[in-house]
Amino acid sequence: MKFKYIVAVSFLIASAYARSEENDEQSLSQRDVLEEESLREIRGIGTKILGGLKTAVKGALKELASTYVNGKRTAEDHEVMKRLEAVMRDLDSLDYPEEASERETRGFNQEEIANLFTKKEKRILGPVIKTIGGVIGGLLKNLG
């Protein structure tokens, strides 16, 4: 009789353990899905902000470039125009960063993708912002 109880209790413990393992796997997969959706939302927001900023900067740079085109240029003005053109090319290369990032990072896990995307943004945006700051500073110095 005791043997039957031992077998029954063992069976109940084993089935409870199997159910808990199954629930753990489901909760982990749900958590992974939520993390992936969060990363996509963050990237989408970042891309929209970057796109708006890029559009504003491109408009300002085109306005500054047209101002320089209409007047006489010195060697310094010519250098500023070259910088503006380089910045415009850099901004144009940012048109589809997410697609390029997806192509380059196929097979990586989500954390590596997020780190690579952030590093790529820093690598591109750092020099662009520095150049824009220098150009605008030079323009203000020349105009003032």
From Swiss-Prot:
Record-stated family: Belongs to the bombinin family.
Protein role: Maximin-8 shows antimicrobial activity against bacteria and against the fungus C.albicans. It has little hemolytic activity. Maximin-H7 shows antimicrobial activity against bacteria and against the fungus C.albicans. Shows strong hemolytic activity.
Keyword Glycoprotein in annotation: no
Location in the cell: Secreted
Chain coiled-coil ranges: none
Organism: Bombina maxima (Giant fire-bellied toad)
Superkingdom of origin: Eukaryota
Tissues showing expression: Expressed by the skin glands.
PTM-bearing positions, type Leucine amide: 143
Residues found modified as Asparagine amide: 70
Cystine bridges: none
Gene Ontology CC, one term: extracellular region
Signal peptide: 1-18
Protein name: Maximins 8/H7
Propeptide positions: 19-43, 74-123
